[in-house]
């Protein structure tokens, strides 16, 4: 399971010209689900992402996690993260989970985020979405379990 996380000052996801989810300062999490992923990996990745200290403390050091910073979370499914780009000029999608499995694990991940009490917004799994963000820093990390 892969999370491309970005520290943002704001982010929103739009579907069919309607805002599906929006946050102010916090984390935009682009989530990719691979074939071998399961609930245990979703739990581990969620815990790691939410504990990852990429927000500045009073001294300007990256020392706070999203909860400590008072931030929010926007989770967007992105199957293109689970690709094979080692050969050729077109991505291969054989590493990605089947849609039903990916949806179940995406829902599991977002439910776990919500259960922590951090305000969590989402896109819609499988939808054609437009994501707008202001990356703060820029600060972007690739986390994988």
From Swiss-Prot:
This is D-aminoacyl-tRNA deacylase. The keyword Cytoplasm applies. Its main location: cytoplasm. An aminoacyl-tRNA editing enzyme that deacylates mischarged D-aminoacyl-tRNAs. Also deacylates mischarged glycyl-tRNA(Ala), protecting cells against glycine mischarging by AlaRS. Acts via tRNA-based rather than protein-based catalysis; rejects L-amino acids rather than detecting D-amino acids in the active site. By recycling D-aminoacyl-tRNA to D-amino acids and free tRNA molecules, this enzyme counteracts the toxicity associated with the formation of D-aminoacyl-tRNA entities in vivo and helps enforce protein L-homochirality. It comes from the Bacteria. InterPro entries: Daa-tRNA_deacyls_DTD, DTD-like_sf. The gene is dtd. It is found in: Cytoplasm. One of its GO terms (cellular component) is cytoplasm. A Gly-cisPro motif from one monomer fits into the active site of the other monomer to allow specific chiral rejection of L-amino acids. Pfam families: Tyr_Deacylase (PF02580). Its EC number is 3.1.1.96. It catalyses: glycyl-tRNA(Ala) + H2O = tRNA(Ala) + glycine + H(+); a D-aminoacyl-tRNA + H2O = a tRNA + a D-alpha-amino acid + H(+). Coiled coil: none annotated. The keyword Amino-acid biosynthesis does not apply. A motif (Gly-cisPro motif, important for rejection of L-amino acids) lies at residues 137-138. Homodimer. One of its GO terms (biological process) is D-amino acid catabolic process.
